[in-house]
């Protein structure tokens, strides 16, 4: 203010922050205005005109009641989700099996509020989705981790051994895994469920792209252990709508009611998500095209000399670069934003539209000539331990 001495703005160090949060890095993927954005695994196909019109009409109807709180339990939305999943998985589901929230990260947070917390632990198999440890930290759940195999796939024997030895209260399994893209078979999941003493969360954010059956098929076999989480941010092209959900036995839904904030899901979000579900067949029609593009990109990268990790999602992890952060910058200089997920020698690229993928491949061809390291399979094991986060390097998110 005029006439007064300026008071220095406090820093984070000046605040009475919890000690266990000091020194932590927040999640952050760059949001940059570049010609080609392939860094956050969104569906590049925009919503259809019919879907947009439906959302506008639905939100307009909801807006007439904005002076009232929304449906606290989102019953109609959960019923729509149950119908969609019943058709997709072949498993008969009802509203009592579904819970919804603002993105799958809020779902994961609620699960750890209910089944994690002080004195409890959660384990994940790295490299994997970076929000699993971040949400664990935020809920005071001790984070444990075990390494994946040298090719970044889940070594089920090693995973079972780690769960048996460390007896975590919560086990995270991403299938398909982010950032490597591999899915876990139902037989592998059964072995983990048999070994786990507590809850197993199968994170199926990219489930619509997977060639493996959904873990939803196992909910009836493991009603006190299995929770499957999903999102509408990826295949459903609804990232801006922020809608995540889980599938589980009704008792798990009752647990969510104990920890959710009242009226957590706005009437606008519920209306827009229900409209998106009405157009599921049209929107998900892009999945086959994206899988075909993913395979085209993978084949082209392999032909250039890159090591491409076989993917079951809408992205590919590829390398091996002599200096991945420097290569990430060179892609950006070429107008292509991809992701440095913190694995030494590797970068991740979302599958975009054909013309976006062509631009990415042109940049890749230029980099392949000068920036690839000699393949050293033995060194890949070290990639399971992420380097320190910096710029965009938060392991595997989103």
From Swiss-Prot:
GO terms for biological process: L-histidine biosynthetic process. It catalyses: L-histidinol phosphate + 2-oxoglutarate = 3-(imidazol-4-yl)-2-oxopropyl phosphate + L-glutamate. The modification N6-(pyridoxal phosphate)lysine is found at residue 234. Its EC number is 2.6.1.9. Pfam families: Aminotran_1_2. The keyword Amino-acid biosynthesis applies. Its cofactor is pyridoxal 5'-phosphate. GO terms for molecular function: histidinol-phosphate transaminase activity; pyridoxal phosphate binding. Residues 1-30 are annotated as: Disordered. Homodimer. HAMAP family: HisC_aminotrans_2 (MF_01023). This is Histidinol-phosphate aminotransferase. The gene is hisC.
